[in-house]
Amino acid sequence: MKKMLSLLLALTMLFALVACGQKDKTIVYAVEAGSAGEAVALEKGYEINSVDTQAKALMEVDAGTSDAAIIDSLMAGAMVGEGTSYPDLICTDQKLTEELYGAGCRKGSDLAAFINDVMSEAYADGTMKDIAITYGVQEALIEQPAPTGSTPAADGDVAYIQGKGTLVVGITDFAPMDYKDANGEWIGFDADMAKIVAEKLGVKIQFVEIDWDNKVFELDGKAIDVVWNGMTLTDAMLAAMECTNAYCNNAQVVVTKG
């Protein structure tokens, strides 16, 4: 009888320890290095697994190497759930932030004002909305103000880009804003808008995948001319870059396995 009681006590303690261990398990969040998702995760004291892109953050969750991912709501809408690249993942109701997207140019660059005018014209004539519908982001689209009709400086970035004949756009693989189609061509809401800007400038366009954490260095070193990749307009970005008007609403959301 004593042996039986001892065995039952041991089993009870074992189950208690297992339950405690499960309760105290730390959730690991996959985030893109240098992103708004990483910033909010660090602010909340979450344990994180920083990766190169938000697409890789989803891969981490899908592979079981991270418990959850913090990504942009616009990407979650395009990549997560039934009929998407990740049908076994779900976007939870947990919304960590609400934010705005904008493009970033070199500090003091007149390219930002040029892009603003192009976006204003594209919004007014319906082109911007048509592109948004194509990529399913029409509900996030922000109304653009009237064009200012700003005149680029003779020695400014617009003249520099026109002189070299190519607009170099810094991006990451980030559907539905920038991603490759079946032919390996870059498409997406941001990519298509950037193509319109290049056309208005009278230059070719080149998309360059960048390390998101080094985007400001890439700009300042003139490796790229603009960051146009679902960039959140944080105080840090506004201080480091000449940013365009906001054009899309966004949020940081949590994605897990279903």
Summary of predicted features, one role per range:
Residues 25-88, 108-109, 232, 245, ...:
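Pocket-lining segment of extracytoplasmic ligand-binding domains
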Residues 44-54, 58-60, 72, 130, ...:
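Extracytoplasmic small-molecule ligand-binding "clamshell" domains
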Residues 21-23:
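Bacterial signal peptide processing site
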Residues 38-48, 88, 119-159, 163:
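Ligand-binding clefts/hinges and TM-proximal coupling segments of bilobed small-molecule sensing domains
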Residues 16-19:
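C-terminal motif of bacterial Sec signal peptides marking the signal peptidase cleavage site
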